[in-house]
């Protein structure tokens, strides 16, 4: 799938965002720690893994609701805060669409009991629906347009953004609320990741290091607001300018060693902007050795021959890996930074994937016509890229 914007296609702008994760309870708090390159990871003793690190949302009340599962409750929380900050009216919301992305949905609330939640039996069936996340946002915000839930593993958040962009570009709505939530810190889910050998075994928080051994699981909830207009609105944080996906057709869990699917996805994105600089990439960088190898090979294949390579901005060393919510969280962070004409700094002393690829420890300035790519990769060999422009 290839979907760059070309005239006279309308502008699809990100005009607001909210989030909660281990870095903070709102996007401003999160950005404060991102700008300081401060990680929010800590030992998971309270979650049954005292020798592993991960990230959790401190305010557990955000995930408590009698009608909805914990992921749905968090989606409603971040969506309401984003919409209130933007000032959408009741009429605006009624005509909007909802696109949700989640890898595990409300699994954390029905595979294991959610601490502190007093659920109602009548909602037992709806609480184990992934689509309850989108439905809850629609119900609680009065959104009467399309509602969709995308569940493509760790690429779910970017897919929700991309599909929302296409929906608006086709003229089916003027506004969309994109939410992405994952809560992987339940005993059942953590056990499955550990059994599959995906969690970090040596506590090394450096995704491209030869010694990297796995990811750090983390919770997150994110809402992004999209609006369409003939010209870019003054309130825009940045423009959502393209969306591409490919599949590896290789293995249910392992990354294709040569990174061929990632290469095709990135190549499609680059070709969509022949006269503009690809200034930066937020790579998937989840910390598993297989993903590091595939991603490195793809980056070298696409950009290795370029005299000026895009800088890399790895955000999972700060936020942990929130599965399907990770791409949306990274997009919110990038959009907030781009509004200020900057790219976020990296965690200190990260390894470069290959010679010439800069992983800057300080925030970088953006030019007006720069393009920023965000990459997500999911189990099953699903790859997604979005393009953001100022």
Residue ranges and their predicted role:
Residues 14-16, 34, 79, 98, ...:
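Conserved small-residue
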Residues 1-14, 90-93, 236, 274-277, ...:
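Flexible, low-complexity linker/loop segments at domain and module junctions
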Residues 3-9, 41-73, 77, 104-163, ...:
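Conserved catalytic cysteine-centered active-site region
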Residues 118-120, 162, 166, 184-234, ...:
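Glycine-/small-residue-rich "gating" segment that lines the acyl/pantetheine channel
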Residues 16-18, 99-102, 151, 176-182, ...:
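Short beta-strand segments
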Residues 74-86, 133, 221, 258-273, ...:
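Short, well-ordered amphipathic alpha-helical segments that serve as non-catalytic structural scaffolds
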Residues 172-195, 200-205, 212, 243-257, ...:
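Acyl-CoA/ACP chain-elongation machinery
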Residues 7-21, 25-53, 203-280:
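Condensing-enzyme catalytic core mediating Claisen C-C bond formation in acyl metabolism
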């Amino acid at each position: 799938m290839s979907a760059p914007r070309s005239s006279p296609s309308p502008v699809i702008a990100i005009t607001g965002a909210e989030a909660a994760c281990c870095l903070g309870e709102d996007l401003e708090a999160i950005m404060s720690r991102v700008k300081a390159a401060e990680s929010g990871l800590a030992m998971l003793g309270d979650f049954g893994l005292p020798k592993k690190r991960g990230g959790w949302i401190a305010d557990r009340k955000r995930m408590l609701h009698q009608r909805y599962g914990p992921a749905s409750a968090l989606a409603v929380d971040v969506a309401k805060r984003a919409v209130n900050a933007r000032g959408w009216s009741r009429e605006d919301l009624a005509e909007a669409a909802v696109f949700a992305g989640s890898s595990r949905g409300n699994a954390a609330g029905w595979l294991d009991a959610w601490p502190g939640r007093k659920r109602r039996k009548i909602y037992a069936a709806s609480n184990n629906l992934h689509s309850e996340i989108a439905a809850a946002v629609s119900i609680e915000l009065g959104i009467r347009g399309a509602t969709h839930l995308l569940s493509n593993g760790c690429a779910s958040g970017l897919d929700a953004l991309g599909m929302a962009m296409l929906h608006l570009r086709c003229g089916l709505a003027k506004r969309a609320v994109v939410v992405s939530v994952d809560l992987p810190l339940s005993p059942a889910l953590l056990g499955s990741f550990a059994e599959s050998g995906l969690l970090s075994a040596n506590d090394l928080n450096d995704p491209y290091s030869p010694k990297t051994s796995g990811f750090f699981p983390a919770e997150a909830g994110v809402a992004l607001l999209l609006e369409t207009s003939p010209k870019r609105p003054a309130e825009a944080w940045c423009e959502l300018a393209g969306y591409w996906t490919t599949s590896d057709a290789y293995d249910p869990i392992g990354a294709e060693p040569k990174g061929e699917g990632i290469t095709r996805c990135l190549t499609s994105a680059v070709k969509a902007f022949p006269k503009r600089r690809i200034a930066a990439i937020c790579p998937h960088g989840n910390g598993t050795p297989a993903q590091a190898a595939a991603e490195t090979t793809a980056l070298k294949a696409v950009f290795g021959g370029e005299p000026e390579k895009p800088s890399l901005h790895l955000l999972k060393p700060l936020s942990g890996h929130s599965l399907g919510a990770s791409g949306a969280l990274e997009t919110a962070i990038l959009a907030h930074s781009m509004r200020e004409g900057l790219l976020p700094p990296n965690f200190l002393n990260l390894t470069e994937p290959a010679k010439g690829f800069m992983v800057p420890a300080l925030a970088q300035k953006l030019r007006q016509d720069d393009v920023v790519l965000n990459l997500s990769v999911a189990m099953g060999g699903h790859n997604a890229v979005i393009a953001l422009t100022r």
